From Swiss-Prot:
InterPro entries: Nep1/2-like, Papain-like_cys_pep_sf, Peptidase_C48_C. PANTHER family: SENTRIN-SPECIFIC PROTEASE 8. Protease that catalyzes two essential functions in the NEDD8 pathway: processing of full-length NEDD8 to its mature form and deconjugation of NEDD8 from targeted proteins such as the pcu1, pcu2 and pcu4 cullins and other proteins. Residues 286-296, 311-324, 355-377 have a biased composition (Basic and acidic residues). It is found in: Cytoplasm. This is NEDD8-specific protease 1. The gene is nep1. It comes from the Eukaryota. Pfam families: Peptidase_C48 (PF02902). GO terms for biological process: protein deneddylation; proteolysis. Its EC number is 3.4.22.-.
């Protein structure tokens, strides 16, 4: 556990200085940063829609790790996890790739899995995706154990990050948007889970979360345990539930949706999701701030480097169509040319339903330098507080039990019908 002083105690969240700093770019979100967003959603948004809110469970990162990696039975898990778990319809699970690294060292990437319990469907959102779902499969298998049903997992197309540190910010943005939709839609359709056209401005979201933290400390103090007052300015300090989140003016790349899904069965769990199809040439305007982020990566922690290769469209007009220089004779009167409807250039408006023709670069496996990525040694997250408990063989502080056997290697966790 970090020895830095506590900046804020907000319900069950204990903010250290590094957690405060993690909200600002170019830093990775800590697990506490994600806890903070979940607490704000539960205390500022849920009271407005109590019936729908009762169906949603935002599972904290430390509990997701417990769910995925603890060598305990489903019955023991039910005791350690929130009582609401077995009655919820929609389970949000922020996934950290902690199992790739030594215990206590921290993971290097955040992604999001949401389980729709009645449908037996899991949706996976990854802002640094290659179309695979390896990081979430342990959690998926344990969810299947808990609810005694098989779940199909679908890798969803989402905005791809353009730097090495915004994965946690994207997870929070995806969570905010999906919760907002669920609260407004008591009977969600499959299209509600589609975030392919959702282009959040994660920089603006980071700034708003920092401002909200400052407002809480300045107006309520450094210890907040009771509910927020009804006059708390949620819409201006946090995010207005009735409005959209901050969005980008210029669209960033979206990973194409995988054409097949994987069930928690032997056949499907041993096969990767289909690789995303490669897109054609691209012609889009890059966000200036995103370009600066790419140059910052050499000076900060990051998990992967992506080099986006952008090609420019060729001139659409053929040589025969190009306008020739014309020098009129003295007797020739120059007429202004008004193009006919057939000559008018049609504006190209990207359509969410016509992704193949959009001028958006689509990230595919062939555009990634896999050998270079494999050689990169991920730098641990600045603070993943659950790791200190793990190193000591203790459960996270959120649990009452301290007697449960805790960790085994991930490959030994899954048995029976769910080999991964």
């Amino acid at each position: 556990m970090s020895s830095s002083p506590t900046v804020l105690e907000l319900f069950d969240v204990c903010f250290k200085q590094e957690d405060v700093d993690s909200l600002k770019k170019p830093n990775w979100f800590t697990d506490v940063s994600i806890d903070y967003v979940d607490e704000l959603i539960e205390h500022l948004w849920f009271p407005s829609y109590p019936n729908q809110a009762n169906e949603i469970l935002l599972l904290r990162p430390s509990l997701v790790f417990l769910l995925a990696e603890a060598a305990i039975s489903p019955e023991e898990l039910k005791v350690a996890l929130p009582k609401k778990l077995m009655n919820c319809k929609y389970l949000f699970m922020p996934i950290n790739d902690l199992d790739k690294h030594a215990a206590g060292s921290g993971g290097s990437h955040w992604s999001l899995m949401v389980a729709s319990i009645p449908d037996g469907q899991c949706y996976y959102y990854d802002s640094l995706s290659n179309g695979k779902t390896k990081d979430c499969r342990s959690a998926l298998a344990r969810v299947s154990d808990l609810f005694k049903k098989k779940f199909t997992i679908e890798c969803m197309p989402v905005q791809q990050q353009r730097n090495g540190y915004d994965c946690g910010a994207h997870v929070c943005a995806f969570t905010l948007e999906l919760v907002r939709r669920l609260l407004h839609s008591p009977m969600p359709t499959s299209s509600m889970w589609n975030l392919s056209t959702f282009q959040p401005d994660v920089t603006a979201i980071r700034e708003q979360l920092s401002r909200c933290l400052d407002h809480i400390i300045n107006s309520l103090g450094t210890r907040v345990s009771g509910d927020f007052d009804e006059d708390f300015p949620t819409g201006t300090v946090f995010f207005d539930l009735e409005s959209h989140l901050p969005l980008l003016d210029v669209a960033l790349p979206v990973l194409p949706k995988s054409s097949d899904s994987s069930e928690t069965s032997h056949e499907s769990s041993n096969s990767n999701l289909k690789k995303s199809s490669e897109s054609g040439s691209t012609n889009h305007h890059n966000n200036h701030e995103s370009d600066k982020d790419l140059h910052h990566e050499g000076h900060h922690h990051h998990h992967h480097h992506h080099h986006h290769h952008h090609s420019h469209d060729d001139d659409p007009s053929s040589p025969a169509e190009k306008k020739q220089n014309h020098v009129p004779s003295p007797s020739e009167k120059i007429q202004d040319h008004v193009p006919s409807p057939s000559e008018k250039k049609q504006d190209r408006v990207p359509s969410p339903s016509n992704n193949k023709e959009d001028h958006l670069p689509l990230l595919s496996d062939e555009k990634l330098d896999k050998s270079a990525i494999d050689k990169i040694e991920p730098t641990p997250l600045p603070s993943v507080h659950m790791n200190s408990h793990i190193a000591k063989g203790e459960l996270p502080k959120f649990h009452n039990s301290t007697d449960n056997p805790f960790l085994t290697p991930p490959e030994e966790l899954v048995s029976g019908d769910f080999p991964f």
